[in-house]
Regions:
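Phosphate-backbone binding and catalysis cores of DNA-processing enzymes
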Residues: 1-149, 303
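Short, cationic-aromatic polyanion-contact patches
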Residues: 84-86, 178-197, 255-270
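A short, conserved structural fragment
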Residues: 64-73, 168-177, 243-250, 328
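Glycine-rich, small/acidic residue-mixed loop/short-helix segments
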Residues: 305-365
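Non-catalytic regulatory appendages
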Residues: 244-305
Length: 365
């Protein structure tokens, strides 16, 4: 692989642009396409991720236009994916699912065997259609299809561990909520077309290049963590498409990769002066700028403040980003944005943040 040498400032500036933080994109589907999905575990955060990039709230695209699909994807968490790319993600997720193992500890925790889980997954594909079903209704239908009343307890658990394999195979996605009740539908029935995953080789290659195009330069360990499995498969992907990749050395540190088609653009980013990619940016919770890649986060978060950003139970805080670093965390309190600084900010930068937040005021703490 050809090698390019860049600085961290060039990297953070380039990544801000690739993540649509320096240009407005009104279409939430285009945002989801660029970002490799929009986080949707917390609905308000997903809306914020789209809106900070200039897009409309994704709800209309998801539930009315059906151009976005809400489903379990990376790391087994809910994301909004472009409906016309579901075959890509299903192909890669199905391949990931094929590598799962179910040790006795997993079976004890979830109350089913690996064989049971495969049967449940097949049954989900058989009973779901275009009519939304609640978790309770889906559990009852699966039990009836399999003749297994003993599955009532395991299927009722709130985290969906027994339903995620069906999502990976493209047999299940979220339907519109019924009040406070989540529902599920068949993606094929919901979209009115067959959903057949791409072959694993094609899908994995495309997922790797997509990730690097928006989060690179990154390591294969970064890819694996984002995708939700061990590093070995990501290393295989990188070896299989080595001709499409460029090695990147960042401030003398090697081990990073970027798509070869992006290498020239990355190297051309200026290292000095001011740049739109320097921010400031007020990013919502679970923003992809923070989530991936981890190798960037250890440079972006001030020493001793990792737990302010990545909190208990996997919660990723809303952050203030300045010059490629997390300068603070924030939350909303009525008509105020309360910013808790993790680093000192010049007065001019504070004024820029206040202008960015208008008409909402900023309370500095």
């Amino acid at each position: 692989m050809v090698r390019v040498r860049v600085t961290w400032r060039q990297v953070t500036r380039w990544r801000a642009g690739r993540q649509l933080l320096t240009a407005r994109e009104p279409d939430p589907v285009a945002v989801a396409r660029r970002l490799c999905g929009i986080h949707a575990q917390v609905t308000s955060c997903g809306a914020g991720i789209a809106q900070v990039r200039g897009a409309a709230d994704p709800d209309t695209a998801t539930w009315t236009d059906r151009t976005l699909v809400r489903t379990w994807a990376m790391r087994g968490t809910l994301h909004l994916l472009p409906a016309d790319e579901l075959e890509l993600w299903t192909g890669a997720l199905t391949d990931r699912e094929s590598r799962r193992r179910f040790p006795p500890s997993w079976e004890r925790e979830h109350g089913v065997t690996g064989q049971d889980l495969h049967a449940i997954t097949d049954a989900v594909g058989e009973v779901l259609g275009a009519t939304p079903m609640s978790r309770t209704e889906l559990a009852a239908a699966v039990q009836a299809r399999l003749g297994r009343t003993d599955l009532a307890g395991p299927l009722a658990t709130g985290w969906g561990a027994l339903l995620k394999p069906a999502a990976a195979r493209g047999l299940l996605c979220s339907g519109p909520a019924d009040g406070q009740t989540s529902t599920f539908v068949s993606p094929a029935a919901w979209l009115g077309r067959t959903v057949t995953g791409l072959d694993a080789g094609t899908a994995n290659r495309e997922v790797l290049l997509r990730f690097l195009s928006v989060n690179g330069p990154a390591t294969t360990a970064d890819v694996a963590r984002w995708w939700g499995e061990q590093p070995a498969p990501a290393r295989r992907w990188a070896r299989s498409c080595a001709d499409d990749l460029t090695e990147v050395e960042i401030d003398g540190e090697s081990g990073y990769l970027v798509a070869r088609s992006d290498a020239e653009e990355l190297a051309a980013v200026p290292d000095g002066g001011t740049h739109p990619g320097d921010g400031p940016f007020l990013l919502p919770g679970f923003d992809p700028w923070v989530i991936a890649p981890l190798s960037h986060r250890r440079r972006a978060v001030p020493d001793g403040h990792e737990k302010d950003v990545s909190r208990t139970a996997g919660w990723i805080s809303p952050v203030l980003v300045v010059d490629g670093r997390v300068a603070g965390v924030w939350d909303r309190d009525g008509d105020l944005i309360r910013v808790r600084l993790l680093d000192r900010l010049p007065a001019a930068t504070r004024r820029a943040v206040e202008a960015l937040a208008r008409p909402t005021g900023v309370d500095w703490t």
